[in-house]
Amino acid sequence: MIQGIQITKSDNENLLNSIWLIDNEKNEARCLVAPAQYKEDQVVPASELGEYESREVAIEAPKAQEGGQHLNVNVLKRETLEDAIKHPENYPQLTIRVSGYAVRFNSLTPEQQQDVLTRTFTESL
């Protein structure tokens, strides 16, 4: 279980008012905010914090979201892709979006190029 704390008293003055996530199962501490010595998001053994007094800080995990829509936008003409299929040497830098990734059109197989052409351009909505 992970617990959020703010250190209110410590022999190490660099820890005063710092905020940490303490993972008791792994015996680790992740720094969220510290005035000195520790960097944000730094993970250290919990024993490195030494003796301290603290107050609990509420932790809220974001709700998981499922579903949604994905849209790839390629701004070009159908004729450009058709010409790139016929004359790839004229379009060495032509980059398109496929499933959220940028890819060089010429690196796709002929079947993939035709699939992109079919999916990208429609007659109507």
Curated annotation (Swiss-Prot):
Positions in coiled-coil regions: none
Keywords in alphabetical order: Organic radical
Source species: Psychromonas ingrahamii (strain DSM 17664 / CCUG 51855 / 37)
Gene: grcA
Domain annotation Glycine radical: ranges: 5-125
Gene3D superfamilies in the record: 3.20.70.20
Entry's Gene Ontology molecular function annotations: formate C-acetyltransferase activity
Keyword Phosphoprotein attributed: no
PANTHER family referenced in this protein's UniProt entry, alphabetically: FORMATE ACETYLTRANSFERASE (PTHR30191), FORMATE ACETYLTRANSFERASE 1 (PTHR30191:SF0)
Described function: Acts as a radical domain for damaged PFL and possibly other radical proteins.
Protein's name in the database: Autonomous glycyl radical cofactor
Glycine radical modifications at: G100
GO cellular component, one term: cytosol
